[in-house]
Structures are given as structure tokens and as C-alpha cells.
Curated annotation (Swiss-Prot):
Upper taxonomic lineage: Bacteria, Pseudomonadati, Pseudomonadota, Gammaproteobacteria, Enterobacterales
Sorted UniProt keywords: Cell inner membrane, Cell membrane, Glycosyltransferase, Membrane, Transferase
Region listing for Alpha-(1->2)-mannosyltransferase, in residue ranges: 1-374
Top-level EC class as recorded in UniProt: transferase
Protein known as: Serotype-specific mannosyltransferase WbdA
Originating organism: Escherichia coli
Domain of life of the source: Bacteria
Length: 815
């Protein structure tokens, strides 16, 4: 119904309000159901403190407070109408709806599905707690400005059994989805269903839950009265989900009527696809309910072309629409009579089939939506305009209401303070928060941390229209805090203390650091911010520890599967540093669906990193021997490698290649720029004692970005021999300096450099030695690939590229 209203709303703006106390999976499901119709801007989540289920008396204070918190959220959305699709909920869970008793600047319209508990108090209101809950809700229900009933029968119940005047009640009817339709199934599909549910070739079908008003006992009794040949030809298939004790009771009842247990087939739970198939395949659908608000199963069956019989009371005559197809559900002989006629009178059966399609075509969600929108319009036309400023008075009154609730603990009150702040959408300025959890604690000056520094710097410098840009960090066992002390020490201006972060609607967290060590603990924080309407986005630099675990230390091997599975299940967006990484992430998630349940709202995309060292908040300073190093570089063709030394980086193979070249008498220099990393102890020991060290071999650790830029400018070429990268910043930095590149032919390098690099393959030293010689020959002829033709971005452009991948809401155009 709600989707149809949105689809047919025309010039009217429609928003949805989601209960933030529900599990994040439920919130995901709701967003998923509307994401093709509504923008994130029109999806609101209200916060409150759970649990609020009325069945537990200790929750009553929180329940009242949650209603007040919801009112504050609504006041900040400032709608003309609040449309409550299901009102009598919240006894067993934290579902929260209410109709204010005081004057508020919106109208409330409630859907009435039925008043079955009110009309059957002995059966449904025997529990004093539930009776109190239901009658309280009914008193609230009567305050609604309008009631939209799903049938004329339900509308009449409202008029007759409540204090709601008839001019406030409108029948908008109901409908079923387009998936319920006549379908021509293949023989293979039919046989599969028969095998799955032990179905005969022909059968009578009924569908319901096991409860007295569904009248299954009368149906079984009536079926037992059919002639034996009809029973034998048409077993009864009951699409009921039953508990073992219920099943045994029903089977004993059937035996008491002379039926064998094999004549009743219980399907158990049915998927929608299988239910639709059974509607299509059944000989007859029978629905003997004693009371319905509408009666969806008969309409579903008729939409699927099934010959359909049903009760002649409450709403079912409106749905079935033909007296001859109905029976008195209290009279088993009448049920038997109509069933037997349908199974033996061919002309009547054909009429039932034809009527099913003609009658079901009268119901559609579009018709229901149009009736609802007409009702909204009439309600507003008959109402006085409200003062939008009343939103502030609603907030003030609800805060006073919360203060007077004695049953709230101090923890409850603290949670409600945060909830009220989150629900105050009008006062909220959207925030773009850069997660620098690693950088804020320890800037190890790795490539990833250079990315974090650069992106943060550009976002702070350029700003994002409509958003406050800041940095945050997470400390295990605590919460997210603003990284204001870090900002104060690295950027001009005063930023204040490291206060806790209050995530609110449309805020965006973008984690540029690698925070695998914080998972799975960080999941609670992510779910909490998303339940407040914020977005959690993470940059993925690579997943090499998952693809090649031997390249990583044990801790990373342990953390990475947890990290990526948590991101797949809980993050809104994964933004990879290259298309190659994005494809790898998608593939890994697909390969691991047996244990990873990805967030259905999640998108995986990519951007490219920047390269301008000047904009990456570069370190400065020249080493004492800078001039000697630069002179050595100028004295012979010099090749440079840049990056932390790790097994995958190819340093050992490259060193061995140059040793071959030196043995051949080649006067080439190799400059290795990078500190010692993991599992390269023997290689580093070899470097420290190498006979060519500081002659033709130079190992530079912890140099400044300023000096690195000098080395790029004076080298003959960059050698990038890595066997795996997410992006490869040195490649882009070299291109920016117009430094030619000799690189391994891995997918990400081909994505970035394309034909503008000299590629090699193989893991033997001779493969690199050969590539160097071939490249030099081309270089001497001025025919080598030109790295300056590689497309690269400044950090400003990279930050802009990143923003396009984030759920940033553009500022509204000025009128």
C-alpha cells in the first residue's frame, strides 16, 4: 500500500519514518523496499531507548518516552499528515506509534485492518496485560483525524464499535502484488513441487494460520463429508505452518471424522514462489474463515486463476464477490455442498475460474492509493492551517513529559538525551567525518596513512557544501570521538577537545585508514550510527592478505577475514582505490556467501588516489648526505624502488637482477627507498653488508617527502616489481614527475598505466634484468613508453572523486 501511495503521490512529498530501535537488518529491509522510490533524504529514522514492549511492566516508562521521542522526530520532519499503517502493535516488541492527545501541527491517519480482538474479547483479550494494552491503544486510535479501513466490513466495525464518527472513516480497500498471476509452469517445475511437498496430481488447497477463527476444523469436517471418490481424487493440501502438538491434534480430529492421515497434506512454510505455484496448480481453493478484515488469500488465489470458495461473512463477500461461490462457515454441510458442486459441476467450475480473474482485476494497489490520497486531500482541505513554529513547542512539551516519567533510570535518560538530539533533524547540520583512527594514534607514514592525511587535508581545505567536515577516531572500548587534538597539531585553527561524536541523519563517516584491528568490536558503533540514519563508508586499499596470506603477518591474516566480512555485512559503501580491487572485493564476497551475509543496501565502487606530494601534507628536510646521494644518482643510470620492504614487493628479485647486471659490468645504480617491513630480515641483513652498498646500491630509510621528490626527479626510471597492490602510489608519483616506469604486469598496474609503462613478467632475476636492458635501449632511442601520459589525479581531484562515491546530499537550490 505504502509503495503505491508514493508512486501515485504526484506533487505531494512523501517521507517514511523508521523505528531506530529495530535491529539494523530490519532497518536495511525497510530502506531496501523503498530505495527505488525515495531518496535517502526522505527516509527518516527516529531514535529512542529500548526495550519498550508493553508486555513487561518495567518497559512502560521507556514506552511513553519512546512515543515522546517519536513525536519530536515527527515535529522536526514537519509533515502535514502522519499515516500509520499498523497501529495495534508494540505489545511484544519495540514497535512504537501513538496519537498525541494535545494539539500538534500534523494530522494522524490510521489504517484499520480489523477490530477482531475487540469483537472477540474472550478469545483474544483474556490476558489482562494484553487487554490493557489493546484497550489503551483503542482509546488512542479513536483520537485519529481519519481512519482508512481496508474493507467496508472493517469500516463498519469502526463505526459501530468505537466512538469514531462515520465521516472520519473511509474504505480504501486492499490488493495484492503483481507477482500473483496466472503462470504456465514447466513439467520440471511442477514435478519439483510435487516432490518437495508430496503433492498429488490434483488437490484442494487451503491457506491460513492455526487459530480458531480460521475454522480449519470445520473445513476438515466438511471435507470428510464429501463422497469417497472425491476425497480419493482430491486430497486436501493445507498450506499451514503448524507446531508438532497442533499437527497431532488436527490429525486426530481428522481420524475422528473417518479420514486417514494421508488424506491431509501439510506443506509447512511456503516461499512466495511456491505459494503462487500452488495457487496456480490447485483444483480448488477454499477459505472458511469466521472473521477477516479483508482476506488476502482468496484474492491471491483468484489472481492466480484458482477456482475460489469462501465464507459469506465479514469482509469476504467484498473480496470473492459472488454469492454462489460462498458458504456459511458455521455450517459444515453448506461448506461440503459448495465444495462438492465445484468438484462435480463442470459448468459451475468454469464459471468459478472465469469469475476469479474478473473479480480479482477490480483490486489494485493503485486504486487503493488513489482513494487514500483523495482522503488525505479532503482531510487537509477541511483543516485549519497549522503554524510550523509549533514544532518547537512539541519538542518542549515532550521533553517536559519525559522529565516526569519516574520509571526511567539515569541510563535511560542519558540515552533519551542522545535520541532527542538525533531526532532534532531541523537543528542538525550534516557532518562528513573522516575516520583517522590509526593516523590519530600513530602516523607511521605508510602509503595508506599518506592517503588519509591527503584526503583529510583536501576535504578540510575545500569543504563540502552543506556539511561540516571534521576528523574522528575510535579507541577500543570507548566510542567515536572528534580528532580535534590531532587537527590542532597539524592544521591551522582551534578545534576544541576530543568530544564524543553524535551521529545523526545523513551524516557520513568515511574511513580512509585501515582499521582491521578494530573489528569486530567496531560493528556495534557502525550499526548504532546507521540506526541513527548516518552512513558508514570505508575505503578498501586491497585485500591481498585474503588472496595471498603468505604475504602478511599472522595478525593480519587473522584480522582480515573478520574485517572484510564485517564491512560486507554492516557498511553502506565500500570504496576501493582501483577497479581491480573493487572487482576483487565483489568476487570475495560472492565466494563467501555461505558465511558472509552482505548488507543488501551496500554498493562497492572505486576511485583513484592522488599523487601530488605537495598536497599530501608532506614531510620536509634533507639528509646530511643528500648532495652525495644526488651526485651518485647523476653519475650513472639510476633506478629507484619506493615502498616499505615486504616479501611481495619484489626487492629480492630486483636486487638479484642488478647483481647479474653488475657482474656483467653494467654501471647502473639501484636506490631502494623504504623502511624494513615484515619477514625481510635476511634480505635487509644482506643489504646492510652488501659489497655495493653506497657504491651502486643505496638503501634509504625514513627520508622526507621533500627528498623523495628530489630522487624521483633525478632517477632514470622507477622499478615497481610488486606482485600485488591495491593501487600503487609510487607509480602515480613517478608519472607526475615524468619519471619512466618499469613495472610488473599485474592487473592494477595495467589499469592505471595502460600502454604508458614498460612491463615485465616472471619471477626470475633475469626477467627484471632483461626488462631493464630492453627499456634502456628504447630510452637511448627516445622510444620508451612515456609515463607522463598516465592519467593521474591531484589529491584535490582524488578527494572530489571520492565524494562522488559517498552518499552526499546536494544543498537545496535557492528559490
Amino acid at each position: 500500500m505504502s509503495r503505491a501511495i508514493i508512486e501515485n503521490a504526484g506533487e505531494h512529498r512523501v517521507s517514511i519514518l523508521i523505528n531506530g530501535m529495530y535491529p539494523i537488518d530490519n532497518i536495511n529491509d525497510v530502506k531496501m523496499a523503498y530505495r527505488d522510490l525515495l531518496t535517502d533524504e526522505d527516509m527518516f529514522i527516529f531514535s529512542a531507548v529500548a526495550p519498550t514492549a508493553y508486555r513487561h511492566i518495567e518497559n512502560h516508562g521507556r514506552s511513553k518516552a519512546a512515543q515522546a521521542a517519536r513525536d519530536i522526530a515527527i515535529a522536526n520532519i514537519a509533515p502535514d499528515i502522519v499515516y500509520v499503517i499498523s497501529f495495534f502493535e508494540g505489545h511484544s516488541d519495540s514497535y512504537t506509534v501513538s496519537i498525541p492527545a494535545d494539539n500538534v501541527p500534523w494530522k494522524t491517519v490510521c489504517v484499520c485492518h480489523d477490530l477482531i480482538p475487540l469483537l472477540n474479547k474472550e478469545r483474544y483479550l483474556g490476558d489482562p496485560n494484553f487487554r490493557e494494552f489493546y484497550m489503551n491503544k483503542l482509546a488512542e486510535f479513536e483520537r485519529a483525524d481519519a481512519i482508512f479501513a481496508i474493507s467496508q466490513s472493517a469500516a463498519q466495525e469502526v463505526i459501530e464499535y468505537t466512538d469514531i464518527a462515520s465521516d472520519r472513516v473511509l474504505n480504501i480497500s486492499s490488493a495484492v502484488g503483481e507477482e500473483f498471476a496466472v503462470i504456465d509452469y514447466s513439467a520440471e517445475r511442477i514435478q519439483s513441487l510435487k516432490d518437495k511437498y508430496s503433492l498429488p496430481d490434483e488437490f484442494i488447497l487451503s491457506l491460513a494460520m492455526i487459530e480458531p477463527r480460521k475454522n480449519i476444523e470445520a473445513l476438515i469436517h466438511a471435507y470428510s463429508l464429501l463422497p469417497a471418490e472425491l476425497q480419493q481424487r482430491y486430497p486436501m493440501v493445507l498450506a499451514y505452518k503448524v507446531q508438532p502438538e497442533q499437527l497431532e491434534r488436527i490429525l486426530r480430529l481428522a481420524e475422528s471424522y473417518g479420514l486417514s492421515r494421508s488424506q491431509l497434506i501439510f506443506t509447512g512454510f511456503l516461499t512466495d514462489d511456491d505459494l503462487i505455484a500452488l495457487y496456480n496448480l490447485c483444483k480448488l481453493f477454499v477459505f472458511p474463515s469466521l472473521h477477516e478484515g479483508f482476506g488476502l488469500p482468496p484474492l491471491e488465489a483468484m489472481r492466480c486463476g484458482a477456482a475460489t470458495l469462501g465464507s459469506n461473512i465479514t469482509s469476504l463477500p467484498e473480496v470473492i464477490g459472488w454469492e454462489d461461490a460462498m458458504f456459511n462457515p458455521h455450517d459444515v454441510q453448506d461448506i461440503r455442498r459448495v465444495m462438492e458442486k465445484a468438484l462435480t459441476d463442470e459448468a459451475f467450475y468454469r464459471e468459478l475460474k472465469a469469475h476469479a480473474l474478473a473479480q480479482s482485476a477490480k483490486f489494485s494497489w493503485a486504486n487503493t492509493a488513489h482513494l487514500a490520497i483523495e482522503g488525505f486531500t479532503r482531510l487537509l482541505q477541511s483543516s485549519q492551517e497549522t503554524d510550523a513554529g509549533q514544532a518547537e513547542s512539541v519538542t518542549a512539551s515532550r521533553l517536559q513529559m519525559m522529565q516526569k516519567i519516574d520509571a526511567l533510570s539515569e541510563v535511560d535518560r542519558l540515552g533519551l538525551a542522545w535520541a532527542v538530539a538525533r531526532n532534532s533533524f531541523k537543528r542538525h547540520t550534516r557532518k562528513l567525518l573522516v575516520d583517522i583512527s590509526v593516523l590519530a594514534h600513530d602516523d607511521a607514514k605508510t602509503g595508506i596513512q599518506r592517503v588519509s592525511r591527503s584526503i583529510l587535508s583536501e576535504l578540510l581545505k575545500s569543504g563540502v557544501p552543506g556539511y561540516e567536515v571534521s576528523a574522528v577516531y575510535y579507541t577500543p572500548g570507548e566510542c567515536y570521538r572528534y580528532a580535534n587534538q590531532y587537527l590542532s597539531s597539524h592544521f591551522p585553527g582551534e578545534f576544541g577537545a576530543d568530544e564524543p561524536v553524535l551521529f545523526s541523519k545523513d551524516d557520513v563517516l568515511i574511513a580512509t585508514d585501515l582499521t582491521a584491528h578494530l573489528f569486530p568490536e567496531l560493528v556495534t558503533q557502525i550499526d548504532s550510527m546507521r540506526a541513527a540514519g548516518a552512513f558508514a563508508c570505508f575505503v578498501v586499499h586491497d585485500i591481498l592478505p585474503l588472496r595471498r596470506p603468505e604475504w602478511s603477518i599472522e595478525g593480519i591474516q587473522r584480522d582480515f577475514p573478520i574485517w572484510l566480512s564485517c564491512l560486507a555485512e554492516h557498511a553502506d559503501r565500500l570504496i576501493c582505490v582501483s577497479a581491480s580491487v573493487a572487482e576483487d572485493v565483489k568476487a570475495w564476497i560472492a565466494e563467501n556467501r555461505h558465511w558472509v551475509k552482505p548488507n543488501p543496501l551496500q554498493t562497492v565502487s572505486n576511485f583513484h588516489l592522488g599523487a601530488d606530494l605537495d598536497a599530501s601534507v608532506p614531510s620536509t628536510g634533507m639528509p646530511d648526505n643528500a648532495q652525495a646521494l644526488l651526485a651518485a644518482m647523476a653519475a650513472a643510470p639510476s633506478f629507484i624502488m619506493v615502498g616499505t620492504m615486504e616479501p611481495r614487493k619484489g626487492h629480492a628479485q630486483t636486487l638479484a637482477a642488478f647483481e647479474e647486471l653488475w657482474r656483467e659490468g653494467k654501471d647502473y645504480n639501484l636506490f631502494i627507498v623504504g623502511k624494513q617491513g615484515w619477514n625481510v630480515d635476511s634480505l635487509c641483513e644482506k643489504l646492510r653488508h652488501h659489497p655495493q652498498l653506497n657504491k651502486k646500491l643505496f638503501w634509504l630509510q625514513n627520508i622526507s617527502d621533500e627528498f623523495l621528490a628530489e630522487l624521483y626527479a633525478r632517477s632514470r626510471a622507477l622499478i615497481f616489481a610488486s606482485q600485488g597492490e591495491g593501487f600503487g602510489l609510487p607509480l602515480i608519483e613517478a608519472a607526475q614527475k615524468k619519471l619512466p616506469v618499469i613495472i610488473r604486469d599485474i592487473p592494477v598496474f595495467k589499469e592505471i598505466a595502460q600502454e604508458h609503462a614498460w612491463y615485465f613478467s616472471g619471477e626470475a632475476p633475469s626477467d627484471i634484468a632483461k626488462a631493464v636492458e630492453e627499456w634502456l635501449a628504447l630510452y637511448e632511442q627516445n622510444a620508451h613508453p612515456r609515463s607522463e601520459n598516465i592519467n593521474w589525479l591531484t589529491w584535490k581531484q582524488s578527494a572530489e572523486f571520492l565524494l562522488k562515491n559517498l552518499p552526499i546530499i546536494a544543498p537545496a537550490a535557492k528559490q
